[in-house]
Swiss-Prot record:
GO molecular function, one term: rRNA binding
Gene Ontology biological process: ribosomal small subunit biogenesis; translation
Subunit record text: Part of the 30S ribosomal subunit. Contacts protein S5. The interaction surface between S4 and S5 is involved in control of translational fidelity.
Cross-referenced SUPFAM superfamilies: Alpha-L RNA-binding motif (SSF55174)
Gene: rps4
Family: Belongs to the universal ribosomal protein uS4 family.
Function: One of the primary rRNA binding proteins, it binds directly to 16S rRNA where it nucleates assembly of the body of the 30S subunit.
Domain S4 RNA-binding: 103-165
Identification of the protein by name: Small ribosomal subunit protein uS4
One GO CC annotation: small ribosomal subunit
InterPro entries: Ribosomal_uS4, Ribosomal_uS4_arc, Ribosomal_uS4_CS, Ribosomal_uS4_euk/arc, Ribosomal_uS4_N, S4_RNA-bd, S4_RNA-bd_sf
Sorted UniProt keywords: Ribonucleoprotein, Ribosomal protein, RNA-binding, rRNA-binding
Length: 180
């Protein structure tokens, strides 16, 4: 069978543990996006660092292969919904961690009005009440692709799929109260 690949961390911890400005910023992001722990935030920060690192390397690179990789990076970020279709490589450098956090399934479920709060959105996802493109996704940190965004609904077998579910009625009332 061969040797399995070694599992590696998907995040980098901060270089210094007690920088007050960073701690304050992380606390606000953790609260606003209802993250379970800072590891979730660090994972998305590391993803963003990697995108930016690739963009800086490709800005300096010349040649046919560099142009192919530029297009692939821009296409990937477009599919993730992080950049518009007409973006250039410099736009990658202006991305923030908030842009990445806005593409999480948990955030999109809340923004679409399928949940009253971010924490409820997380719970609905973990409990299997939300499906994306007909597939139940149980990971709140799943980055939703641009074409999948319109397919986010309550799961077919979920009690929330019924129109008369009491919690759905509360969510609808909260949505209408917010619009008025």
């Amino acid at each position: 069978m061969g040797d399995p690949k070694r599992q590696r961390k998907k995040y980098e911890t901060p270089s210094h543990p007690w920088i007050k400005e960073r701690l304050d910023r992380e606390r606000v992001l953790k609260r606003n996006y209802a993250l379970k722990n800072k590891k979730e935030l660090w994972r998305h920060e590391t993803q963003l660092k990697e995108f930016r690192r690739r963009a800086r390397r490709l800005l300096a690179a010349r040649g046919k292969q560099a142009e192919i990789e530029r297009q692939q990076l821009l296409q990937r970020l477009y599919r993730l919904g992080l950049l518009p279709a007409d973006a250039v490589l410099d736009d990658v450098l202006s991305l923030t961690v908030e842009d990445v956090l806005e593409r999480r399934l948990q955030t999109i479920v809340y923004r679409k009005g399928l949940a009253r709060t971010m924490k409820q959105a997380r719970q609905l996802i973990v409990h299997g009440h939300i499906e994306v493109n007909g597939q139940v996704i149980r990971s709140p940190g799943y980055l939703v692709l641009r074409e999948e965004e319109d397919t986010i609904t309550y799961a077919k077998g979920s009690p929330f799929a019924k129109e008369g579910h009491p919690e759905r009625m509360v969510i609808e009332q909260a949505k209408q109260g917010g619009e008025a």
